[in-house]
């Protein structure tokens, strides 16, 4: 796989796939971190004398034009970061777009309209996607993928364009993800630990199976811990649990025991009868029948933090409790704070909820790396080859 700084891009037109799927309130962007993250690649391209045609998606328009999902706000915000006007094309393919692209001069940037206004972008088969990727590729000399957030999706702009493009490469954001996540999986400094939380074991099975045996310790919190507690024969009251995965949880615990990975589960909890009010702390042997386990308790937080403090590499995905509700946020925030204050450790965070915890704690600058991917981050940690990387490797 080649990267943008390995190609001669002077005077070339770049077709750059980015992840600008940002939250909007009307036409106002409420969080522009995804746009900000791509700026270094844009600045490098412009400094080297290239022009850039930007392509991205926003929301789920389901193959139809939806005016409220136009990329106009993203084009405006990108222009503000680059100090120039970034005109928005009326579509992403077609004669008018081709004319705009042909007239683009070195040092200029234009943005294509939402790729998902065309059903072909997300169609399942190459036959259904048709020539959509070829039409996009024809707009430029070089394809640049800088969108880790969609690297796990076999969309036309991710997997078809590289095969149709004259040249292709990864941008700096994709390069960062590749290097940090690759290092975490292959050359991690030890002790190496994984911290996983969130609601469901089912969404983390791949990570559990791939990392157990590779990490020294695996901390499990959040509602997904309930399924493991049930597998140990413990009561969990009315807590969220995946009863169909109890046997799977037992298998995972057995695998950890035989492979040298120490599994850490919570032993006390903040519980409630509803998700608004905390009733207090209970330990794992005295969970109220009408109670829900909604956060790890102080003893569990202390135990988890001791494991974190002695680690050199940490990969974190998923909160320790229902952090969106203030009474049940303390476990996640405590774990976050301890990670953020480590001086000599590589700390890697991924996933929307985990990212939200870090921003809620205002500690985003204290982590080694915060991944821009949700599903991509999970699949990378599952050991899967992401479609975006496969396409770039095969066409570099």
Swiss-Prot record:
Keywords: ATP-binding, Cytoplasm, Glycolysis, Kinase, Nucleotide-binding, Transferase. It is found in: Cytoplasm. Gene3D superfamilies: Phosphoglycerate kinase, N-terminal domain. One of its GO terms (biological process) is gluconeogenesis. It catalyses: (2R)-3-phosphoglycerate + ATP = (2R)-3-phospho-glyceroyl phosphate + ADP. The keyword Isomerase does not apply. The keyword ATP-binding applies. Coiled coil: none annotated. Belongs to the phosphoglycerate kinase family. Monomer. This is Phosphoglycerate kinase. It comes from Maridesulfovibrio salexigens (strain ATCC 14822 / DSM 2638 / NCIMB 8403 / VKM B-1763). The lineage of its organism: Bacteria, Pseudomonadati, Thermodesulfobacteriota, Desulfovibrionia, Desulfovibrionales. The gene is pgk.
């Amino acid at each position: 796989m080649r990267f943008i700084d390995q190609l001669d891009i002077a005077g070339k037109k770049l077709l750059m796939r980015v992840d600008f799927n940002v939250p909007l309130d009307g036409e106002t962007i409420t969080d522009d971190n995804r746009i900000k993250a791509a700026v270094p690649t844009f600045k490098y391209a412009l400094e080297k004398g290239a022009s850039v045609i930007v392509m991205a998606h926003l929301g789920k328009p389901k193959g139809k034009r939806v005016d409220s999902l136009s990329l106009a706000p993203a084009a405006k915000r990108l222009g503000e970061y680059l100090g120039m006007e970034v005109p928005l094309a009326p579509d992403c393919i077609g004669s008018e777009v081709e004319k705009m692209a042909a007239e683009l001069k070195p040092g200029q940037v234009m943005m294509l309209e939402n790729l998902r206004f065309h059903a072909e972008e997300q169609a399942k088969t190459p036959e259904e996607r048709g020539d959509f990727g070829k039409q996009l590729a024809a707009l430029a000399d070089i394809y640049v993928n800088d969108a880790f957030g969609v690297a796990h999706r076999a969309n036309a702009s991710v997997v078809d364009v590289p095969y149709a493009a004259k040249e292709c490469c990864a941008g700096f954001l994709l390069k960062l993800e590749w290097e940090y996540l690759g290092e975490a999986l292959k050359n991690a400094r030890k002790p190496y630990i994984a911290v996983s939380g969130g609601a469901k074991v089912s969404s983390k099975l791949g990570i559990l199976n791939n990392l157990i045996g590779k990490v020294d310790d695996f901390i499990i919190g959040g509602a997904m811990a309930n399924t493991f507690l049930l597998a140990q024969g413990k009561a969990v009251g009315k807590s969220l649990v995946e009863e169909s995965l109890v046997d799977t949880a037992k298998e995972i615990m057995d695998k950890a025991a035989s492979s040298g990975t120490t599994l850490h589960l919570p032993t006390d909890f903040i519980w409630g009868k509803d998700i608004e009010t905390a009733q207090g702390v209970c330990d794992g042997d005295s969970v109220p029948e009408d109670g829900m386990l909604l956060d790890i308790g102080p003893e569990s937080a202390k135990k988890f933090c001791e494991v974190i403090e002695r680690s050199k590499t940490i990969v974190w995905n998923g909160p320790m409790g229902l952090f969106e509700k203030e009474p049940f946020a303390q476990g996640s925030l405590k774990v976050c704070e301890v990670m953020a204050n480590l001086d000599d450790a590589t700390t890697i965070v991924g996933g929307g909820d985990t990212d939200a915890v870090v921003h809620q704690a205002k500690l985003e600058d204290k982590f080694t790396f915060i991944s821009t991917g949700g599903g991509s981050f999970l699949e990378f940690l599952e050991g899967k080859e992401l479609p975006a990387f496969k396409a770039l490797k095969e066409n570099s």
